[in-house]
Amino acid sequence: MSNYYSSNPKLYVGIDCIIFGFNEGELNLLLLKRNFEPAMGEWSLMGGFVQEDESVDDAAKRVLNELTGLEDVYMEQVQAFGAIDRDPGERVVSIVYYALININEYDKESVQQHNAFWVNINELPALIFDHPQMVEKARKLMQQKASTEPIGFNLLPKLFTLSQLQSLYEAIYGESIDKRNFRKRIAEMDYIEKTDKIDKTGSKRGAASVSYTHLTLPT
């Protein structure tokens, strides 16, 4: 048995995290400037390698925590990327995850130390290697999941208006949503509660805030 393992090549198992945030009606990605070769100084997703004493899920949580300082964040595995020449440094198979976070709740000092920045998803710079394909796959998976489960609420603060909620889903799908139909669908949801608080950031009159009664967190 030992000869079987030793006679086969070893390779690296990497983790790449696609971190989504929502700000001022736009979907954003947290990207960083790579500080090592190959591709030093170019735009990249946050990543790392799976260690011998951790599962791929635990590795993804660690990578996310190292950048944002956050725990108990919604994360989902997207797929593996394993093209032979995908990383010019070494033979690396990368397991991709996406995470949904409140853009106002993360360790800003840690993000600055990693030279990371929030970038509008519609204005992304050129990304290294196969990272553009990773982002595309992750966004499609998020769109599919958001159509059947309330995962989008993980991108919002605890209190929000229905207009903000509609703006979020328009950003997720990249298209306008009919207000009347959207409000009708929201009214049928039993996990949204109206509060007595008024949000006046959009107008002098203000709009009633609502809250989401439970978040979809990772299992």
What does each model-found stretch correspond to?
Residues 2-43:
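N-terminal strand-loop-strand
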Residues 213-219:
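Conserved small/polar residues in nucleotide/adenosyl-binding loops
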Residues 11-13, 58-61, 65-105, 123, ...:
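Active-site segment of metal-dependent pyrophosphate-handling enzymes
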Residues 168-175:
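Short helix-coil junctions and helix-kink-helix linkers
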Residues 197-204:
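Short, Lys/Arg-rich nucleic-acid/phosphate-binding segment
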Residues 98, 107-142, 146, 155-163, ...:
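NUDIX/MutT-family hydrolases
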Residues 204-212:
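Short, cationic-aromatic polyanion-contact patches
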